[in-house]
């Protein structure tokens, strides 16, 4: 998907109302839990799609109604790959939204129904009008119904505190995702995608829109390192289908309030933060067949944004990830450049969008500031310092795991001895 496609995704955002979508879903899907409760419908934030939260009338089920943008709707193989990945992860025990079959899909599933050339028994197409002056009077948009994962997004807030433990837990969860995806493949994910980290050199064309000379120079240094450090290993890096966008907006967490005892016994009666643990993964719009190491590089980049210690927070995510899905020595050595590559892609594309949308430029450029700050922190630290620090964080995590195992074994030994004493 090119930068032109990225722009078209925004231009081809579905033009519909919640009532339009609910009526269409009622006509094409039968939901567990009964009919949709009209009073429950809430539109959710989305960059270029339309998403609606709904609850059934009996209150037992929650869903997301998703209307895809026009660009994605014309890529049935990609839609099929997204569905297949969600079902694969669900079967592997990873909490993800699961597509609900259309009524037509349920009827024809036994004979292997095909829709528009690919398996797509969970997609229906809603015809929507286009603005006056368009080449065509209407456009078909793909509609899905997805099961809902309860929780909150992992974006940092008063309730979701990014402690080292939380970041390691996020990394461990994403390591589970990566491990589950080793056995997954779908031809629909084999595509050229601008947001595939392996294609970051294509972003060079859009980096010309970066107005600040120092930021432009910073971006060019990343492109140079990518050419000289990463590309010589391109043919030998492990490859597979990746979710490719595990940022703090796409990880779902469960927040637990601290117990009264925890608050009472807190040192100095300080405030005890709520505990958050990752419980789900959202958004499969960017899936792509790429280098497996990109999965963690992308997450490290996003969880470093807006932080006092971007390098350290990224290292905590990495330590958790490698405890579940170890990287090779080469993959680990390339991480500083790959993390920087995702940050450059985000910042350069943001600058390009601002240049194309002058009325919204101030806001778009403001949102890029955390990205530039994180990128500068990684580049100022240097590859060797980043790698040395991350290795230390991984060792500390392993030392903690050994200690916990020792404590657990000691507790088990005490229980066994107690049983022996009582048996005398």
List the predicted regions and their residue ranges:
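Active-site activation/catalytic loop segments of kinase-like enzymes and analogous catalytic loops
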Residues: 292-326, 341-358
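A glycine-centered beta->alpha junction motif in the catalytic cores
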Residues: 70, 105, 139, 143-160, ...
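Active-site acidic catalytic loop and adjacent metal/ATP-binding pocket
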Residues: 47-64, 99, 227-294, 408-424
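Juxta-kinase regulatory segment immediately upstream of eukaryotic protein kinase catalytic domains
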Residues: 1-37
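A cross-family kinase active-site recognition segment
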Residues: 157-217, 237-239, 265, 365
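ATP-binding pocket architecture of kinase catalytic cores
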Residues: 57-185
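ATP-binding glycine-rich phosphate-binding loop
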Residues: 31-55
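ATP/Mg2+ or Mg2+-diphosphate-binding catalytic cores
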Residues: 3-5, 9-10, 208-209, 346-424
């Amino acid at each position: 998907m090119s930068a032109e496609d990225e722009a078209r995704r925004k231009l081809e955002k579905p033009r519909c109302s919640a009532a339009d979508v609910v009526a269409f879903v009622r006509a094409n899907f039968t939901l567990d839990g009964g009919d949709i409760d009209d009073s429950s419908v809430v539109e959710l934030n989305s960059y270029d799609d339309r998403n609606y939260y709904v609850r059934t009338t009996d209150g037992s089920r929650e869903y997301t109604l998703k209307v895809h943008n026009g660009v994605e709707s014309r890529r049935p193989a990609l839609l099929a790959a997204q569905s297949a990945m969600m079902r694969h992860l669900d079967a592997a025990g990873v909490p993800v939204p699961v597509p609900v079959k259309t009524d037509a899909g349920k009827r024809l599933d036994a004979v292997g129904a095909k829709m528009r050339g690919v398996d797509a028994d969970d997609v229906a197409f809603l015809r929507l009008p286009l603005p006056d002056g368009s080449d065509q009077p209407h456009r078909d948009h793909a509609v899905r119904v997805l099961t809902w994962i309860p929780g909150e997004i992992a974006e940092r807030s008063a309730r979701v505190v990014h402690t080292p433990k939380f970041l390691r837990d996020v990394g461990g969860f994403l390591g589970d995702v990566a491990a589950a995806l080793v056995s997954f493949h779908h031809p629909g994910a084999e595509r050229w995608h601008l947001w595939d980290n392996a294609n970051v050199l294509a972003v060079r064309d859009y980096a010309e829109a970066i107005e600040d000379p120092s930021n432009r120079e910073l971006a060019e240094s990343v492109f140079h390192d990518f050419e000289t450090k990463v590309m010589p290993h391109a043919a030998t890096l492990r490859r597979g289908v990746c979710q490719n966008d595990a940022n703090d907006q796409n990880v779902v967490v469960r927040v637990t309030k601290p117990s009264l005892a925890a608050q009472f016994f807190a040192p100095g009666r300080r405030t005890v933060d709520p505990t958050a643990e990752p419980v789900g993964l959202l958004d499969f719009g960017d899936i792509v067949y790429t280098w497996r190491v990109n999965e963690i590089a992308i997450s490290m980049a996003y969880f470093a944004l807006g932080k006092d210690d971007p390098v350290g927070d990224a290292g905590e995510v990495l330590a958790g990830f490698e405890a579940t899905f170890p990287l090779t020595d080469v993959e680990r050595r390339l991480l500083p450049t790959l993390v920087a590559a995702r940050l450059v892609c985000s910042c350069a594309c943001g600058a390009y969008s601002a240049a194309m949308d002058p009325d919204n430029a101030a806001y778009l450029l403001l949102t890029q500031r955390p990205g530039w700050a994180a990128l500068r922190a990684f580049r100022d630290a240097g590859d060797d310092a980043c790698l040395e620090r991350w290795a230390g964080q991984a060792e500390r995590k392993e030392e903690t795991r050994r200690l916990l195992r020792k404590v657990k074994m000691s507790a088990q030994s005490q229980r066994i001895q107690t049983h022996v004493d009582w048996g005398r």
